[in-house]
């Protein structure tokens, strides 16, 4: 009886020690902070987006930039050609043999030299000079648009990198949760056959999560290698914020997006290289139409010539003016240019309308997304607390493994959704700042 009592007391002590161990382990199994609404505002020292100097250095090495410079140099020559115009001086040399029929005179030789040049009328000259100025302005607008396009392309590449970071963080989170659950199941395996089955299931979950984490990290490393080839000067040692305070610090850092949509719309349209380029192209078409209309009155040509006739016995000096007779094709070309100009105006209006609506939609998404972010993080905090309590209940035998897995998966899903929405808002804000001229200029 004494031996049986000692065995019973030892079993009770072991159960008590095991219970205390499980409770302590479960309280530390998940270290994510409990969140309240007072913790959702804050600052962050994490900077996910490269600095202006880093972006400038990265883009300076892009082949597309060199191609843009070459194209702009060609447009400078195009402007010079427009200033000069297709006006050339023509040299005419002639020689003829004169053989009289009814005369005793011998054969004589006539020689002539003439110069002729088309004259550009003064109103056409003014249009050509304005057209050349428009070409140079268009070249500057194309350069600005090309630089903006490079920055937007860079943002898309960086977006891919950050999404791989997000995938890795999601896999890390799942792996950590699976590890904590397996530890709890391992501590309960002595309770019987069902507890051992739970331990095996938890171990399988942990191995699967670990494999997913390895795959996520390999995809991230592959993306880094891809971007290093294109942007070798950039550093990729970055990690995502994991708390709402850090995310709100990033979203509220440095630049404040305009809250007045009408003001933001005006700023967007006024400084957009795309709109400026469309306006300058319309200006060019207008000048082209005006030039073609003026060409219905052809340019005259002025020439001078000297000649020697009868083997030098006679000298002739003369001046001549020639004016082409305009044909029907000039009037048709003028009407065609007017139609092209009207089409350009309509396309410009459509472009501006599309840009205005796109900006309003993105600004609205930013404002509404920012409002939705706080309750999303709060929802995650509640689900996370429920998952932790469910794990404690599992340690006490109050919850099944299936219930714990379900609670943890819901909490992890809420965490990933909050993290993903935070990242997408940061990318949305960065794109808006880029388009409004507030970033990477």
Q: Where do the PLM segments sit?
A:
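A glycine-/polar-enriched beta->alpha junction
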Residues: 56-66, 73-88, 102, 113-131, ...
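Amphipathic alpha-helical coiled-coil segments
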Residues: 67-82, 139, 146, 150-175, ...
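Bacterial Sec-pathway N-terminal export signals of envelope proteins
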Residues: 29-95, 119, 127, 193-196, ...
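Bacterial N-terminal signal peptides
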Residues: 15-25
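Periplasmic alpha-helical coiled-coil/stalk elements that build and connect Gram-negative outer-membrane
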Residues: 2, 7-8, 146-271, 362-365, ...
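Hydrophobic/aromatic residues within transmembrane alpha-helices of membrane transport systems
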Residues: 58, 115, 161, 227, ...
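Small/polar, glycine/serine/threonine/aspartate-rich low-complexity segments that form flexible
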Residues: 33-50, 91-130, 244-257, 299-336
């Amino acid at each position: 009886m004494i031996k049986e009592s000692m065995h019973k007391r030892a079993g009770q002590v072991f159960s008590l020690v095991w219970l205390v161990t499980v409770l302590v382990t479960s309280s530390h199994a998940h270290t994510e902070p409990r969140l309240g609404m007072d913790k959702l505002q804050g600052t962050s020292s994490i900077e996910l987006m490269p600095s202006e100097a880093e972006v400038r250095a990265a883009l300076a090495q892009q082949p597309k930039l060199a191609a843009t410079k070459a194209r702009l140099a060609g447009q400078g020559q195009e402007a010079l050609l427009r200033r000069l115009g297709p006006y050339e001086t023509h040299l005419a040399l002639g020689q003829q043999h004169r053989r009289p029929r009814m005369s005793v005179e011998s054969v004589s030789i006539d020689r002539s030299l003439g110069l002729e040049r088309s004259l550009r009328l003064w109103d056409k000259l003014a249009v050509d000079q304005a057209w050349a100025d428009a070409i140079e302005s268009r070249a500057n607008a194309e350069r600005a648009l090309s630089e903006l396009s490079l920055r937007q392309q860079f943002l898309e590449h960086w977006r891919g990198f950050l999404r791989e970071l997000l995938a890795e963080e999601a896999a890390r989170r799942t792996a950590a949760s699976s590890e904590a659950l397996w530890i709890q199941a391992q501590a309960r395996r002595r309770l019987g056959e069902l507890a051992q089955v739970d331990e095996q299931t938890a171990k399988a979950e942990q191995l699967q999560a670990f494999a997913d984490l390895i795959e996520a990290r390999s995809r991230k490393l592959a993306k880094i290698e891809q971007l290093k080839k294109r942007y070798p000067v950039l550093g990729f040692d970055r990690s995502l914020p994991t708390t709402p305070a850090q995310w709100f610090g990033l979203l509220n850092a440095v630049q404040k997006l305009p809250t007045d949509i009408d003001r933001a719309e005006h700023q967007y349209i006024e400084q957009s290289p795309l709109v400026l380029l469309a306006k300058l192209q319309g200006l060019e078409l207008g000048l082209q139409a005006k030039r073609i209309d003026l060409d219905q009155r052809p340019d005259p040509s002025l020439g001078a010539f000297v000649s020697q006739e009868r083997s030098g016995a006679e000298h002739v000096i003369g001046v001549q003016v020639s004016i082409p007779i305009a044909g029907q094709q000039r009037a048709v070309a003028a009407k065609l240019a007017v139609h092209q100009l009207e089409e350009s105006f309509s396309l410009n209006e459509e472009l501006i309308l599309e840009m205005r609506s796109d900006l309003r939609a993105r600004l609205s998404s930013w404002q509404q997304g920012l409002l939705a972010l706080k309750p999303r993080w709060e929802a995650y905090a509640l689900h996370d607390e429920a998952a932790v309590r469910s794990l404690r209940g599992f340690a006490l035998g109050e919850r099944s493994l299936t219930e714990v897995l379900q609670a943890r998966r819901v909490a992890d899903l809420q965490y990933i959704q909050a993290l993903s929405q935070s990242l997408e808002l940061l990318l949305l804000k960065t794109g808006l700042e880029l388009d409004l001229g507030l970033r990477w200029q």
